[in-house]
Amino acid sequence: EQRLNSLLCLLESYLSAFPSSTNTAESPDISLFDHLKTTAAIGVCISEYLAAEQETQFKKRLFDNEKQFMDEQAFLLYSADFSGIQKFIYTVASDKALRSLRSRSFFLELAMEHYADELLSLCGVGRANLLYTGGGHCYMLLPNTTEVRAAIERWNRRFNDWLSEQFGISLFLAHGYTPCSGNELVDFPAERSPYKKMFRCVSSALAGHCLLYTSPSPRDKRQS
């Protein structure tokens, strides 16, 4: 796994400025690195998905029945987002405030990187499946299997338990995911805007998880 991550770093260093397509009729807006990284992410998701279903007839499933497989929800689009960032960062004493702001921002970035790395490992995939991370937010493409969904819930619960022990209720990591197919990832059919709907579903799942965190419990309501 460490060697794969090192290879990914090397590819990013040397191939980020090269276009994935050399066809002059096409717009060179995607780097060769991004193309390779995304292809690897999709490939490992398909591999894990088929392994979970104990599929052995890969050619038949993926090529002979390509149209059918493209409609299968073999992937999970996953997202996680820190809730309470503004309050956590800016609730500082005026003395040495700038240093405190920087350290807290750095902590959040480090915490998200740790969360993402651990989750990717638990799901049996690598950094290629991390689509984006930054600003206390991340997106991942994961295999849609029972084991992966269980790992997602366990790790998020464990991570939030640790946040609660360290910071009380001031910081929480909301998360959400939605199953998606190959056709949805390539926005087909375009007239139905499946790509937009896919991200809308993830955002709704995130908001729902965050709402559970911010809503008072029955016990809190009785005490108030």
Model-predicted segments: where are they?
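Regulatory and interdomain segments flanking nucleotide-handling catalytic cores
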Residues: 1-219, 224
